[in-house]
Amino acid sequence: YVTRGVTTLALFFMLFAVEAAVRLNIKTAAEGEAVKQQLLKAADINAAVQAQTPSFIKEHYRQLSGMTNAYVCGVGANLGTASEGALKFGETVSIPTAAYEVEEYIHGPNIQMTPRYSVFLIDGGEGTERIHRIFEGTKIVTDNAFLLTRCADYKDEHNVMYVPMD
């Protein structure tokens, strides 16, 4: 599923917030323009992710089609990404999926894991290194641990979707 309406609404709210911040002198015009450039970059990254997704699915088809349940974990702003990811798994492949902030995940949900569980970890910001350590630990329990990352150190690893953001 591609939900352009939600994406468009989110972009509208972000642009509205930038414009309001500039008009209320919370941000300078230059700061507002810098945020707008980041939003443009985000759109390019989104296109890159969409371009990579079919090959990732093809490479991991057996694992993905055999999922019976999943966790999707993020940190910082990517907690929202994790929540949306969990929702999409429920909508598209009809499996129970929970979204967690990564620290929540390691304080309970990971304890009940078995090798049949699927776990998707999304890095970003200050929590990137922590997510990477948790990814390594999760791989001890299940072969179905996946990492979505912008860290080039992981780009050739199994079960990793590397998204360059330069």
Predicted regions and their residues:
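A SIS-like phosphosugar-recognition module
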Residues: 1-166
